[in-house]
A protein has these predicted regions:
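Sec-dependent N-terminal signal peptides
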Residues: 2-26
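Beta-propeller-forming repeat regions
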Residues: 27-73, 77-197
Length: 197
């Protein structure tokens, strides 16, 4: 009987080792690459587009390329452009865009008429110009007070659906997501670049 129990114990140990090896192998095998985004970068004169849709007071920044994606989730391509310029509140009526402060709104108060007076950016203010359906321009937004050094296309889940969003990284490494909720743009913290290291 003792011999039988030893063999049974070894058999259980062997089966457990096989299952453990399979589990570890499944964790270390790299997953298939995510499908490439269907968004392509079209050839367009961004400076002329910005001047036409937002006014000639905005100058396109050269350090961050325009970002194309479906930010308003309607199936058409939108564009996000980093620009510098004068106070965007002055051109809202003439160029029919909406100025938003999604960063300060995430902390409770995002009225750009007030929060722009307390801007902590040093030097020239940088804005994110959002143009929905840029080929046949739709809604337009100027996002102010969003801290960023890097800006890139990202993806996130919103109301159980995958959506395009902007991923921002500020000078301290804090990462934020800028996304459209159907009415306005929102900013929320998503982590830190230091977390990934």
């Amino acid at each position: 009987m003792r011999k039988f129990l030893e063999i049974l114990g070894l058999l259980i140990l062997l089966v457990s080792a096989v299952f453990l090896a399979k589990e570890l192998n499944a964790q270390t095998v790299p997953q298939a690459a995510a499908p490439e985004s269907k968004v392509t970068t079209p050839k367009v004169d961004i400076a002329a587009l910005v001047a036409k849709e937002f006014g000639d007071k905005f100058k396109v920044a050269t350090d961050i390329a325009p970002i194309f994606g479906d930010f308003d989730h309607d199936g058409t391509q939108d564009v996000a452009v980093v620009a510098t310029g004068d106070n965007p509140l002055m051109g809202e009526g003439l160029h029919n865009y909406k100025t938003l402060d999604p960063y300060n709104a995430s902390f409770g108060y995002g009225n750009p008429k007030v929060t722009m007076a307390f801007s902590t950016s040093e030097g020239v203010s940088r804005y994110i110009l959002m143009l929905h359906s840029w080929q046949a321009p739709g809604r337009k937004f100027v996002l102010v007070n969003v801290p960023f050094e890097k800006l890139r296309l990202g993806h996130m889940m919103y109301k159980k659906k995958p959506i395009d969003a902007l991923e921002s990284v500020d000078s301290t490494g804090v990462q934020g997501a800028i996304y459209f909720d159907g009415k306005k743009y929102r900013w929320e913290i998503i982590g830190s670049e230091l977390d990934a290291k």
